[in-house]
Amino acid sequence: MPGDASMIVIGAGSYGTALAITLARNGHEVLLWGHDPAHIQALEAVRCNQAFLPDVPFPPTLRLEASLPTALAASRDVLIVVPSHVFGSVLTELKPHLRQDARIVWATKGLEAETGRLLQEVAREVLGDQIPLAVLSGPTFARELAAGLPTAIALAATDATFSADLQRLLHCGKSFRVYSNPDLIGVQLGGAVKNVIAIGAGISDGIGFGANARTALITRGLAEMSRLGAAMGAEPGTFMGMAGLGDLVLTCTDNQSRNRRFGLLLGQGVGFEAVQETIGQVVEGYRNTKEVLALAGRYGVEMPITEQIYQVLYQNKNAHQAALTLLGRAQKDERAGG
């Protein structure tokens, strides 16, 4: 029946499932939809996501739904958790079935494929200017979130009421803290750039450069993120919060990060195709590198780390040589651009 769920979650991968579990654990009725009906039926049969979160049973209030129109009729609030390169096409698929009072939030991290646009711009183009929008971003590994381990995240929304409602739905005093932030540009950008820097951190560790180099790369990566954000109109403080520094440190230092593992294998000399096969899931940073570098060019921002990672990924530059290129750059003031 329409109106019988607090939230619809679109995307039954690891992160979408973890967020659905979190919402249901908070006592809310949640519907989880995925594009593959057979996968949804399998999840319903065993009441857990065996592929990604095998040790976390679904709460009773988490329901599975294979029909998109049925799912979207059940609630005004829709949480999208899909890879960034299909974000626009998923919105287009949802649009005819959305309720008139629909509100859209996404936890997708990245930029639109090819154009490099923020996902907010994509949502506005597809859905129009009136629908409330919000984005969740921050240091959240799906396994830890689903297990109920303490986690904090940032939430940015176009509408204050929507922001407050989302905080109420998601916030759990025992394990999940949600910080509101009005800076949609910064919150979205942080989630994209950190993917790129995490690949760089993995490459550095794969080569064997050590903790000093990793920390320097994270710090200078944060500087690149902040410079691009300033040029795009983001608030500087956002990049010192959950969606900036928080997510950057997490993704660069823990091997639960696909982006970091991707870089780690490249740094160890594993071939590109073998790396992709080993990871087995979408590595957002691979596409994001091209898109972030295009954004930097558009706004006239120097991003040397991003540029070298791009050359490794797309121009077959040797990873060790890319690192030496960065180390050999001209001396400059730490506070200066580049």
Swiss-Prot record:
One of its GO terms (molecular function) is glycerol-3-phosphate dehydrogenase [NAD(P)+] activity. The keyword Aminoacyl-tRNA synthetase does not apply. One of its GO terms (cellular component) is cytosol. One of its GO terms (biological process) is carbohydrate metabolic process. Sn-glycerol 3-phosphate binds at K109, G138, T140, K194, D247, S257, R258, N259. NADPH binds at S14, Y15, H35, K109, A142, R258, V282, E284. It is an enzyme of class 1 (oxidoreductase). Coiled coil: none annotated. Its EC number is 1.1.1.94. Pathway: Membrane lipid metabolism; glycerophospholipid metabolism. InterPro entries: 6-PGluconate_DH-like_C_sf (IPR008927), 6PGD_dom2 (IPR013328), G3P_DH_NAD-dep (IPR006168), G3P_DH_NAD-dep_C (IPR006109), G3P_DH_NAD-dep_N (IPR011128), NAD(P)-bd_dom_sf (IPR036291). The keyword Lipid biosynthesis applies. It catalyses: sn-glycerol 3-phosphate + NAD(+) = dihydroxyacetone phosphate + NADH + H(+); sn-glycerol 3-phosphate + NADP(+) = dihydroxyacetone phosphate + NADPH + H(+). Keywords: Cytoplasm, Lipid biosynthesis, Lipid metabolism, NAD, NADP, Nucleotide-binding, Oxidoreductase, Phospholipid biosynthesis, Phospholipid metabolism. Catalyzes the reduction of the glycolytic intermediate dihydroxyacetone phosphate (DHAP) to sn-glycerol 3-phosphate (G3P), the key precursor for phospholipid synthesis. Belongs to the NAD-dependent glycerol-3-phosphate dehydrogenase family. This is Glycerol-3-phosphate dehydrogenase [NAD(P)+]. It comes from Sodalis glossinidius (strain morsitans). The gene is gpsA.
